[in-house]
C-alpha cells in the first residue's frame, strides 16, 4: 500500500534558515539567508549569480545545506542540528524549472498525470481535468508537447506540478522565454489559482514587471544574501542599495557629495563631480540625515526626467540643468536619449516627443528633475 501524502495545512508558512558554502572548485560561493514566506507569492529578485536558484534547490532538497533549518507549517524538511533531511520525493514541494522537461512521447494529459501513479485512474483523470481547466489547456489534452505552443507547454508544466497538491511551489524563471502577452495571461492564471489555494510560492525572476504583477512580497538577493525585502512598492520605489536601484529601473546612478543642507525646506544640495577640474553639477534632493561633505549615491529614473529645448521657467521642479544631446537610440516604441550636462544622463522619451521637439545629437537642451525624483542611497 502506498504511503499517504502528508496532509496539507490550511494556511502554511515556509520558514528557512540556510547556510551553504560551495568550494572554489565548484562555485566559490556561499548562501546565507533567513526568511519567512507566507501563503501566496514571494518573489525572489536579483542579478544572475546572486543565489536565487541555489535557494530554491535547498528548499526542494536537491541541494543540502551545511547548516540551517527548513520547515513548512511546522513540518521540518531539513534541520542540520539533528540531521533531519527529508528526501526530495517526500517533501511535497513542487518545482518548475527553466527547462520544462516534458515527456515528448506523452500527451498533455499523460504528462500532467505523471506524478499520480498512486491514485486510482478515475481520481487521476478528475484531478488532472480540473487543473487543465484552471490553466485553460483542457482542449489540448490529447496533443503532445511538440504540438502546442511555448506558453501552452509552460501551462502543462505548471499543471503537472500542481496536480500533486504540493504544500509549497518553487518557480525558477518559468516565463522567461515567453512573449509579453503570453506571460501576462499565465500570470493571471497563476494569480487566480493562488487565490483559491494559498500555498507558499517562491517565484524567481529577473523581470521587474513580474515582481510588480505577482509579488505580494519580494526578497532581493545579492551575493547569496537577502539585501532588501518588503512589498514591491516598498522595495522598488525608494531603494536604499545600488543593486536594488539598478533592478528597480534607476538608469542614472551617480556619486555625489552633500554640499548644503536646507532643513527649513526639507532638501539637500548635492554636488555631482564632472571629471573636470573644479567642475560639478548641483542637484537638489530630499533631506536625509547627512552632514556637508558626506558622500552619497543619487539614483534617478530615466523616465522621471523631462527634456526641454528652451530653458523652462516658473516650475515647481527644483532642478533645471543645461546640457547637450549626445545620442538618440530607439528601443521598441521608446527613445533613449543621452545628455551630457557635465555628467551623462539617460532620458526616456516617446517617439512623438522626439519628433515634436525635432531632436538631433548636438542640440542644446535642458533637463528638468523634481527633487523627489532623486533617491539617495547607501554607499
Which residue stretches match the model-derived regions?
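A short, proline-enriched helix->beta-strand linker immediately N-terminal to the Walker B motif
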Residues: 163-167
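Glycine/charge-rich catalytic "coupling/switch" loops of P-loop NTPases
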Residues: 276-329, 348-379
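Conserved ABC ATPase signature
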Residues: 144-148, 152
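Internal alpha/beta loop-helix hairpins
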Residues: 195, 205-275
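Conserved ABC ATPase "signature" region
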Residues: 75-80, 123-140, 191-192
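Short coil-to-helix segment of the ABC ATPase nucleotide-binding domain corresponding to the Q-loop/switch region
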Residues: 106-113
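ABC ATPase NBD coupling module
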Residues: 77-94, 118-121, 125-126, 239
Amino acid at each position: 500500500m502506498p504511503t499517504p501524502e502528508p496532509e496539507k495545512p490550511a494556511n502554511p508558512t515556509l520558514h528557512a534558515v540556510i547556510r551553504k558554502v560551495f568550494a572554489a572548485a565548484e562555485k566559490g560561493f556561499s548562501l546565507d539567508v533567513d526568511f519567512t514566506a507566507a501563503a501566496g507569492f514571494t518573489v525572489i529578485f536579483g542579478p544572475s549569480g546572486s543565489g536565487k536558484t541555489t535557494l530554491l534547490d535547498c528548499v526542494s532538497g536537491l541541494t543540502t545545506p551545511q547548516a540551517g533549518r527548513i520547515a513548512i507549517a511546522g513540518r521540518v524538511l531539513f534541520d542540520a542540528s539533528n540531521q533531519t533531511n527529508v528526501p526530495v520525493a517526500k517533501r511535497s514541494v513542487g518545482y518548475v524549472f527553466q527547462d520544462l522537461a516534458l515527456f515528448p512521447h506523452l500527451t498533455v494529459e499523460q504528462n500532467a498525470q505523471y506524478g499520480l501513479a498512486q491514485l486510482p485512474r478515475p481520481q487521476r483523470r478528475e484531478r488532472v481535468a480540473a487543473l487543465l481547466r484552471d490553466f485553460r489547456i483542457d482542449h489540448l489534452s490529447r496533443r503532445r508537447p511538440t504540438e502546442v505552443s511555448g506558453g501552452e507547454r509552460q501551462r502543462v508544466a505548471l499543471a503537472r506540478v500542481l496536480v500533486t497538491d504540493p504544500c509549497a511551489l518553487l518557480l525558477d524563471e518559468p516565463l522567461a522565454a515567453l512573449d509579453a502577452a503570453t506571460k501576462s495571461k499565465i500570470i493571471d492564471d497563476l494569480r487566480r489559482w493562488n487565490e483559491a489555494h494559498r500555498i507558499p510560492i517562491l517565484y524567481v525572476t529577473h523581470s521587474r514587471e513580474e515582481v510588480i504583477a505577482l509579488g505580494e512580497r519580494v526578497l532581493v538577493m545579492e551575493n547569496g544574501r537577502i539585501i532588501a525585502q518588503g512589498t514591491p512598492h516598498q522595495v522598488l520605489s525608494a531603494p536604499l542599495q545600488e543593486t536594488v536601484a539598478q533592478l528597480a529601473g534607476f538608469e542614472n546612478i551617480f556619486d555625489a557629495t552633500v554640499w548644503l543642507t536646507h532643513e527649513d525646506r526639507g532638501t539637500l544640495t548635492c554636488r555631482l563631480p564632472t571629471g573636470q577640474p573644479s567642475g560639478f553639477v548641483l542637484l537638489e534632493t530630499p533631506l536625509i540625515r547627512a552632514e556637508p561633505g558626506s558622500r552619497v549615491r543619487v539614483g534617478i529614473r530615466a523616465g522621471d526626467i523631462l527634456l526641454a529645448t528652451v530653458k523652462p521657467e516658473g516650475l515647481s521642479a527644483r532642478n533645471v540643468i543645461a546640457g547637450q544631446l549626445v545620442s538618440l537610440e530607439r528601443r521598441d516604441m521608446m527613445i533613449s536619449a543621452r545628455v551630457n550636462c557635465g555628467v551623462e544622463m539617460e532620458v526616456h522619451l516617446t517617439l512623438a516627443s522626439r519628433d515634436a521637439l525635432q531632436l538631433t545629437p548636438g542640440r542644446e537642451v535642458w533637463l528638468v528633475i523634481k527633487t523627489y525624483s532623486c533617491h539617495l542611497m547607501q554607499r
